[in-house]
């Protein structure tokens, strides 16, 4: 048993002389830093992508809404013009309905003035 205990001490001394313990710690620390760095990049990338998605969604939606609102305003304006034309037609109808009566009245007055 003493030889295996002595072998462990020699191996331990050899590992310390070669810096294997320090190398192992440095390796673990490097893996930790790489993992931390990757996580940091992941978080930043996710935040940037979310912001871009929100901006794109908002702008696209806002642009679509703005275009739709303008289209509805144009349609409403055309409907109002059409309503004005129908109002004009109603006025023409009223004028034409009373036109014959007014012409008859004018003719009667003319005949009275001329003595016929």
UniProtKB/Swiss-Prot annotation:
Record's subcellular location: Cytoplasm
Keyword Hydrolase attributed: no
Protein name per Swiss-Prot or TrEMBL: Biogenesis of lysosome-related organelles complex 1 subunit CNL1
Recorded family membership: Belongs to the BLOC1S4 family.
Domain of life where this protein originates: Eukaryota
Single biological process term from Gene Ontology: endosome organization
Gene this protein is translated from: CLN1
CDD domains, per the entry: BLOC1_CNL1
Keywords carried by this UniProt record: Coiled coil, Cytoplasm, Transport
Function description: Component of the biogenesis of lysosome-related organelles complex-1 (BLOC-1), a complex that is involved in endosomal cargo sorting.
Subunit structure: Component of the biogenesis of lysosome-related organelles complex-1 (BLOC-1).
Coiled-coil annotated residue ranges, if any: 63-95
């Amino acid at each position: 048993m003493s030889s295996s205990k002595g072998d462990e001490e020699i191996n331990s001394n050899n590992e310390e002389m070669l810096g294997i313990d320090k190398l192992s710690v440095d390796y673990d620390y490097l893996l930790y830093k790489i993992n931390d760095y990757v996580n940091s990049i992941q978080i930043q990338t996710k935040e940037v992508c979310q912001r871009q998605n929100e901006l794109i969604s908002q702008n696209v939606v806002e642009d679509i809404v703005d275009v739709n609102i303008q289209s509805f305003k144009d349609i409403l304006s055309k409907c109002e013009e059409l309503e004005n034309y129908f109002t004009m037609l109603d006025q023409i109808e009223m004028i034409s309905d009373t036109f014959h009566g007014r012409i008859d009245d004018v003719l009667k007055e003319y005949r009275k003035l001329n003595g016929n």
